[in-house]
Amino acid sequence: MCSPPPYPPQGHHYPPSPHGSYYSPTPYGAAPSPPQSSSPHPRGYHSPSPSWGQLPPRPPQEAQSFGGGAPSNYRFQYSACTGRRKALLIGINYIGQPNQLRGCINDVANVSRYLNERCRYRREDMVILTDDQENPLSIPTKNNILRAMQWLVKDAQPNDSLFIHFSGHGGRTPDLDGDEEDGYDDVIYPVDYRTAGHIVDDEMHAIMVRPLRPGVRLTAIFDSCHSGTALDLPYVYSTQGVLKEPNLAKEAAMDLFSAISSYGQGDLTGMAKTAIGFFKKAAIGDSARQRTVMTKTSPADVVMFSGSKDTQTSADTFQDGEARGALSWAFVKTLQERPHQSYLQLLNSIRAELEGKYTQKPQLSCSHPLDVNLLFVM
């Protein structure tokens, strides 16, 4: 099959990539390729879900078609994750600030240990930013985070495996470019956000997703509030493995119920505002998703697990005698117990760990249509 066309570069004005030995990992030798299972259906949405006693099939290595909704000449490539490994781990407790957290630095320590001991990520190929360090380059300021994100993806080659983990405060800001169905962009807060400002999902997508070549894997774990679309990945999957679509019918019922309630209370202004808001949302919802799909797809293999939906908060938890982020803890725990899971099994395992303890619902999203019954690799 012919090679996919190069992804069109789009300029952005962010800080230059980090330089110096601190951000210069040594070369990582390619690991031996594991035996390949038979390739699933190219799109794979209806391939049978593997049982717990059955090893899920590995990702196919031929170029895949995006299908409906994406530019017709685009193809994407799954990564075998046999090449170089690099990781960026960010944990911010906001020490000494009014909104201080407790578990984020612990999250980074636990995730880095897991990557090193179980996933063959070398310490010298990790950049760790936490706000308890003395080295100014290791503090998770806005500038350091942006520079480290550029370091992470610099010179990435097909079958490389990149990993980013963020544990800290997240939030929402009004969307300015029309690519969000709910009218808000997701943001993360650096330790110096009060003076430097937040980092928007559009910005992170431009730095870490847009430049990647076909076959490069970026695995992202965002353990923060309102993190559902923190990388602006257009394909979102439910626990049944189906592609999620905006549920305007459900939202219509909720908004019209609010309008009826306003009328019953004699609040005609409230009724008018609610009705207008619904019809505006119905009009832009589909176009916002189409804009996201058309502009935020990627031929690379980008997969993200986020701590909550866009509208939800994420919780700290207390496990094994220390504070931790709920998603960070559940992600490591489920993979340590069952390392060979499909994407769908992993999402359900994470949700099962949190169910009954927290209201948040971790999300799975991807830069391309994903066969969720394939083996999760990174």
Swiss-Prot record:
GO terms for cellular component: cytoplasm. One of its GO terms (molecular function) is cysteine-type endopeptidase activity. SUPFAM superfamilies: Caspase-like. Residues 1-70 are annotated as: Disordered. It is an enzyme of class 3 (hydrolase). Keywords: Apoptosis, Hydrolase, Protease, Thiol protease, Zymogen. Disulfide bonds: none annotated. Its EC number is 3.4.22.-. It comes from the Eukaryota. The keyword Protease applies. Transmembrane segments: none annotated. The active site is at 169, 225. One of its GO terms (biological process) is proteolysis. Residues 10-29 have a biased composition (Low complexity). Belongs to the peptidase C14B family. Involved in cell death (apoptosis). This is Metacaspase-1B. It comes from Aspergillus terreus (strain NIH 2624 / FGSC A1156).
